[in-house]
Amino acid sequence: MNNNMNHLMNPSADPIAASASSPRDNPCFDIDPTVATLIVFADDEHSYMLPYAQFLYAELIPNPVLETQREAPPEKLTIRFVAAEVEMFGSGFRSIVRALQKYELKFVKSAGRRYAALLKTHIATVAITLTKETP
């Protein structure tokens, strides 16, 4: 047996489709118990690295626009840091909250709506607001 091949290759041509069966392969987020920061890939094509040392709180609520927009994502997650507030809309956010609670959430980013049915955790949108320091 060849000891150099200790892992299986993913034969799926579509990594998003493979993610439905494995939460570790979800393109919307990843978990790493050794991280000290959360990387946020915002929908404006900017990325931000936020230190867990500045984490304040997270709030998971039903999406308030569901009453007027039935096609809207069902959940809203707000992650507040000292200098930034991250807002995400999507579904299945409990796994993200659990990873955040342990400071193991490595990154978050959105994936197209067409993947929502394939993923247990789907992030439809990610926005960040940076807090300006007052001189």
Model-derived features: positions:
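A structural detector for beta-sheet-dominated domains
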Residues: F41, I61, R80-V82, F89, ...
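Short aromatic-glycine motifs in intrinsically disordered, low-complexity regions
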Residues: V35-M49
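Anionic N-terminal interaction surfaces
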Residues: M1-P33
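Short, surface-exposed polybasic-and-hydrophobic patches located at secondary-structure transitions
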Residues: V65-S95
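Helix-rich interaction surfaces within compact, conserved domain-sized segments
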Residues: N3, H7-L8, E85-P135
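Short gly/pro-enriched beta-turn/loop segments at secondary-structure junctions
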Residues: P33-V35, A72
